[in-house]
Amino acid sequence: KDGYLMGADGCKLCVLTAPYDYCACE
């Protein structure tokens, strides 16, 4: 849980976790 990016919709949450990153709708 290093970086969090919220989308404009406020639903998309991108988490950067080495060595890969994933986006999830919380």
Swiss-Prot record:
Q: What is the annotated localization of this protein? A: Secreted
Per its record, what are the GO molecular function terms? sodium channel regulator activity; toxin activity
Q: Which tissues is this chain's protein expressed in?
A: Expressed by the venom gland.
Tell me which domain of life the UniProt entry assigns to the organism this sequence originates from. Eukaryota
UniProt keyword annotations, A-Z: Ion channel impairing toxin, Neurotoxin, Secreted, Toxin, Voltage-gated sodium channel impairing toxin
- Protein's UniProt keywords contain Secreted: yes
GO cellular component, as recorded: extracellular region
Name the protein family: Belongs to the long (4 C-C) scorpion toxin superfamily. Sodium channel inhibitor family. Beta subfamily.
Protein task: Beta toxins bind voltage-independently at site-4 of sodium channels (Nav) and shift the voltage of activation toward more negative potentials thereby affecting sodium channel activation and promoting spontaneous and repetitive firing. This toxin is active against mammals and crustaceans.
Instruction: Specify the protein name.
Output: Toxin TdII-1
The organism encoding this protein is Tityus discrepans (Venezuelan scorpion)
